Curated annotation (Swiss-Prot):
Enzyme Commission number: 7.1.2.2
Gene name, Swiss-Prot/TrEMBL: atpD
Superkingdom, natural source: Bacteria
Gene3D superfamilies reported for this sequence: 2.40.10.170, Bovine Mitochondrial F1-atpase, Atp Synthase Beta Chain, Chain D, domain 3 (1.10.1140.10), P-loop containing nucleotide triphosphate hydrolases (3.40.50.300)
Cellular component terms per the entry's GO annotation: plasma membrane; proton-transporting ATP synthase complex
Protein name in the entry: ATP synthase subunit beta
SUPFAM superfamilies: C-terminal domain of alpha and beta subunits of F1 ATP synthase, N-terminal domain of alpha and beta subunits of F1 ATP synthase, P-loop containing nucleoside triphosphate hydrolases
Length: 471
């Protein structure tokens, strides 16, 4: 065993000297025992980041360095961090090192383990077909449909509903498509991860899901690598079992943020807005592994926190370049009580073309966007002069647009305990039919309130009847 000793500790960054001159490879995992008074000794994992010269390496700690002292003995494992993969991971909760943290039984010692650092699939292995993934969420399926094996970004500031949307997607995919999901909690609230685990256990969805957490309270090393741990588990199901896997990452911004926290300590010059100079490379290494191959697919849905709602910030801007579809959450819509608060004009998808979704779907989607765009253009006039100054055609457009805007909202299954309303899953065909009828003016006589937080157009009619309206 190759052994060295700690020569410097700077928070989450630890320098180690190997006197025999045998330096461990970059990304190798090292271990060191931390002994604290009146406590059980703990094993700290370190990952090699830099060779410094003078027989020393600079490493990033995967857990707290409290109690670590200079001179402590360090052992080189001879390989990168490896985590369990396969059926043993389903229904379990792991940390960045692949250790179970759900108080259940340990993973068997003979279970297969894969390195978290792997090459992306080669060009020849990539799939070339485009297939739509039905989510049951109207605004997504109609205006920014998701692609199987694609990368989808959920953009939004703090508290506009990114995590709730992810939970609903996990629920819908598990219930309607019985697919395998991997959830990577990267630098988010521990309480949310805890709630998610118990909610998924109650609904039975957990049996089809592996969960990996490196939350806000953990050092940046864990937050930097936990997305790779989740991705490695997802890749096994794709490559060895030919499955279509969903990888949820909440939140990809925290992955970048963790990288920037250790970047300066590693001795790198900061780049724009203080981010690490290797931002694009780190993001590319992660994103290029998320793809469809000729064996199976990994579809990733990534929540992306937008600092101060500024979309030009380098972290969200770098992520944009990798995405096939974006779902933009808008604070103004959540303030109006429209949930999910998805902006129908800012959200985009590569799949929204007549060749992929079909001519009727494309025509209805563009009709909806055109109507909402016209309504937004008229809002200034309405604010200054009032509705009476509009032409009859514009009045009709405004009334229809308001109905469409309310109809883009719906109740979620995962929010039933808060709203008291039953969640709805709306198939794509039903969504297209419903919006086509609204655009054609078939339901102009129904009150706007009937369109709020419902599923299909048939539910709107039922709601209008319950309000005492002649249908």
């Amino acid at each position: 065993m190759n052994k060295g000793h700690v020569i410097q500790v700077m928070g989450p960054v630890v320098d180690v000297k190997f006197d025999n001159g045998q330096l461990p490879a970059i990304y190798n995992s090292l271990t060191v025992k931390i002994e604290r008074p009146n406590e059980e000794p703990t094993i700290l994992a370190l990952e090699v980041a830099l060779h410094l010269g003078d027989d020393s390496v600079r490493t990033i700690a995967m857990s707290s360095t409290d109690g670590l002292q200079r001179g402590a003995e360090v052992t080189d494992s001879g390989k990168a961090i490896s985590v369990p993969v396969g059926e043993v991971t389903l229904g379990r909760v792991f940390n960045v090192l692949g250790e179970v943290i759900d108080l259940g039984e340990e993973i068997p010692a003979d279970a297969r383990r894969d390195s978290i650092h792997r090459e992306a699939p080669t060009f020849e292995e990539l799939s070339t077909t485009v297939e739509i993934l039905e989510t049951g969420i109207k605004v997504v399926d109609l205006l920014a449909p998701y692609i199987k094996g694609g990368k989808i970004g959920l953009f939004g500031g703090a508290g506009v509903g990114k995590t709730v949307l992810i939970q609903e997607l996990i629920n819908n995919i598990a219930q309607e498509h019985s697919g395998i999901s991997v959830f990577a909690g990267v630098g988010e609230r521990t309480r949310e991860g805890n709630d998610l685990f118990f909610e998924m256990s109650d609904s039975g969805v957990i049996k089809q899901t592996a969960m990996v957490f490196g939350q806000m309270n953990e050092p940046p090393g864990a937050r930097m690598r936990v997305a790779l741990t989740g991705l490695t588990m997802a890749e096994y199901f794709r490559d060895e079992q030919g499955a279509d896997v969903l990888l949820f990452i909440d939140n990809i911004f925290r992955f970048t943020q963790a990288g920037s926290e250790v970047s300066a300590l590693l001795g790198r010059m900061p780049s724009a807005v203080g981010y690490q100079p290797t931002l694009a490379t780190e993001m590319g290494k992660l994103q290029e592994r998320i793809t469809s191959t000729n064996k199976g697919s990994v579809t990733s849905i990534q929540a992306i926190y937008v600092p101060a709602d500024d979309y030009t910030d380098p972290a969200p801007a770098t992520t944009f370049a990798h995405l096939d579809a974006t779902t933009n959450l808008e604070r103004k819509l959540s303030e109006m009580g429209i949930y999910p608060a998805v902006d129908p004009l800012a959200s985009t998808s590569r799949a929204l073309s007549p060749e992929i979704v079909g001519a009727e779907h494309y025509a209805v989607a563009t009709g909806v966007q055109r109507t909402i765009q016209r309504y937004r253009e008229l809002q200034d006039i309405i604010a200054i002069l009032g509705m009476d100054e509009l032409s009859d055609e514009d009045k009709q457009t405004v009334e229809r647009a308001r109905r469409i805007q309310f109809f883009l909202s719906q109740n979620f299954h995962v929010a039933e305990q808060f709203t008291g309303q039953k969640g709805s899953y709306v198939p794509v065909k039903e969504t297209v039919r419903s919006f086509k009828e609204i655009l054609d003016g078939k339901w102009d006589h129904l009150p706007e309130d009937a369109f709020r937080l419902v599923g299909s157009i048939d539910e709107v009619v039922e709601k209008a009847k319950s309000m005492g309206v002649e249908v």
